[in-house]
Amino acid sequence: MNKNELVSAVAEKAGLTKSDAASAVDAVFDVVQAELKNKGDIRLAGFGSFTVSHRAATKGRNPSTGAEVDIPARNVPKFTPGKGLKDAVNG
């Protein structure tokens, strides 16, 4: 499912116009992104949690030259599914 399909599904399920549903979907994405950017987390009971995980700096190798490369530390988004979502997916 891509974003347009998600917007259509939300519009149909919630009885909204597609433009209202698109605004709602965009707002949710914006809030999640802003919260994670501020290193916060979002916990949705029964669905899952969006958190920020820190990856430490490490050394890597360029596969074509074999030269050692420094890989900088960075923060990455992480999603952990909740029990309700796991149960829904598994049947």
Curated annotation (Swiss-Prot):
InterPro entries: Hist_DNA-bd, Histone-like_DNA-bd_CS, IHF-like_DNA-bd_dom_sf. Gene3D superfamilies: IHF-like DNA-binding proteins. Residues 57-91 are annotated as: Disordered. One of its GO terms (biological process) is chromosome condensation. Pfam families: Bac_DNA_binding (PF00216). Histone-like DNA-binding protein which is capable of wrapping DNA to stabilize it, and thus to prevent its denaturation under extreme environmental conditions. Binds to nod promoters and induces DNA binding. The keyword Nucleotidyltransferase does not apply. This is DNA-binding protein HRL53. It comes from the Bacteria. SUPFAM superfamilies: IHF-like DNA-binding proteins. One of its GO terms (molecular function) is structural constituent of chromatin. Belongs to the bacterial histone-like protein family. It comes from Rhizobium leguminosarum. Keywords: DNA condensation, DNA-binding.
